[in-house]
Amino acid sequence: MLVWLAEYLVQYNTAFNVVSYITFRAIMALLTAMGIGLWIGPEVIRRLQLLKFGQEVRNDGPESHFKKRGTPTMGGIMILIAIGVSTLLWADLRNSYVWFVLFVLFGYGAVGFVDDYWKIKRKNTDGLIARWKYFWLSVIALIAVFGIYAVGKDTAATQLVVPFFKEFMPQLGIFFIILSYFVIVGTSNAVNLTDGLDGLAIVPTIMVASAFALIAWATGNFNFAQYLHIPFVPNAGELVILCTAIVGAGLGFLWYNTYPAQVFMGDVGSLSLGGALGTIAVLVRQELLLVIMGGVFVVEALSVILQVGSYKLRQKRIFRMAPIHHHFELKGWPEPRVIVCFWIITLMLVLIGLVTLKLR
């Protein structure tokens, strides 16, 4: 929005030309989103408390979690507000890629909101009926994916970048739609499963979004894309603004979500953030890199799949409890230790992911 205003005002003062630079707008988007999150946080928490929107806790979970019962949830609302306002202010809204990410972000946020609401109303952790939850997640993802495919179905926009391989970038064609669907829905649910401890999901999200800000900038820059041997996607550069808005909103939320948490993001936050990360990965053609950098999310999701599969097939559990962060808690690890260890692992994986862009 401010891009349009600056384009008009630059005729009166060339200083407004600074708004045309992605780097400037990226920094401002981060600061704006973080400022909004810090500003509205106390009021959002107060209103959630008044509405009695408190977290429900599994009875079979770690005993240390029982004290979390009643902590305000659905704090992801403040994340969505911060990202939305910051993006609308600083992104070039003529860019269709920005709207694809916002569509998934708020669409998944709406599904998460309903899921959280039913958990609170029923006073259990069941939430929205699973088949309806996945139905709406699938509908939103497919609408976005078909839109992305229609807008950019040239060679670069549907290539699959394989880490560590410079020249091997297979053309997916129609299979782009299938892969993209699973990336968006899968990432959304993986982040959702990770969101079980104070700050456990938001910090890895911040780290991965920061990395994607760099990748989006390189992907949207012809010279850097050629240098790194990655597909050049002209519209991708504007996604830097969205990535830094996610980082800023995440930092603002972390202020209130760090141990011991004053508020939880709920499904309204985790589903939407995961969906946004998945969509960004699809748009910059780095789906496989997301698997590396978001390794913590992947392991959390796999632990649940393996646990459920093992119990159904053998009536035996692999872990003491899934997702895997609860396994470590039941082994006696203090919650802060589990959280920080997962943060460190994510930092390592993000750095490895960035290095793969050059080591090919």
From Swiss-Prot:
Against InterPro entries, the record matches this protein to: Glycosyl_transferase_4, PNAcMuramoyl-5peptid_Trfase, PNAcMuramoyl-5peptid_Trfase_CS
What EC number(s) does the entry state? 2.7.8.13
One GO term describing the cellular component: plasma membrane
UniProt pathway annotation: Cell wall biogenesis; peptidoglycan biosynthesis
Name a single GO biological process. Answer: cell wall organization
Keywords carried by this UniProt record = Cell cycle, Cell division, Cell inner membrane, Cell membrane, Cell shape, Cell wall biogenesis/degradation, Magnesium, Membrane, Metal-binding, Peptidoglycan synthesis, Transferase, Transmembrane, Transmembrane helix
Query: What cofactor(s) does the depicted protein rely on?
Result: Mg(2+)
Localization per Swiss-Prot or TrEMBL: Cell inner membrane
PROSITE patterns hit by this protein: MRAY_1 (PS01347), MRAY_2 (PS01348)
Catalyzed reactions per annotation = UDP-N-acetyl-alpha-D-muramoyl-L-alanyl-gamma-D-glutamyl-meso-2,6-diaminopimeloyl-D-alanyl-D-alanine + di-trans,octa-cis-undecaprenyl phosphate = di-trans,octa-cis-undecaprenyl diphospho-N-acetyl-alpha-D-muramoyl-L-alanyl-D-glutamyl-meso-2,6-diaminopimeloyl-D-alanyl-D-alanine + UMP
How is it placed in the membrane, per its record?
Multi-pass membrane protein
- TM annotation in the entry: 21-41, 73-93, 98-118, 132-152, 168-188, 199-219, 236-256, 263-283, 288-308, 338-358
GO MF entries = metal ion binding; phospho-N-acetylmuramoyl-pentapeptide-transferase activity; UDP-N-acetylmuramoyl-L-alanyl-D-glutamyl-meso-2,6-diaminopimelyl-D-alanyl-D-alanine:undecaprenyl-phosphate transferase activity
PANTHER family assigned: PHOSPHO-N-ACETYLMURAMOYL-PENTAPEPTIDE-TRANSFERASE, PHOSPHO-N-ACETYLMURAMOYL-PENTAPEPTIDE-TRANSFERASE HOMOLOG
Stated role: Catalyzes the initial step of the lipid cycle reactions in the biosynthesis of the cell wall peptidoglycan: transfers peptidoglycan precursor phospho-MurNAc-pentapeptide from UDP-MurNAc-pentapeptide onto the lipid carrier undecaprenyl phosphate, yielding undecaprenyl-pyrophosphoryl-MurNAc-pentapeptide, known as lipid I.
Belongs to which family? Belongs to the glycosyltransferase 4 family. MraY subfamily.
- Kindly provide the name given to this protein in its UniProt entry: Phospho-N-acetylmuramoyl-pentapeptide-transferase
Per the UniProt record, the source organism is Actinobacillus pleuropneumoniae serotype 7 (strain AP76)
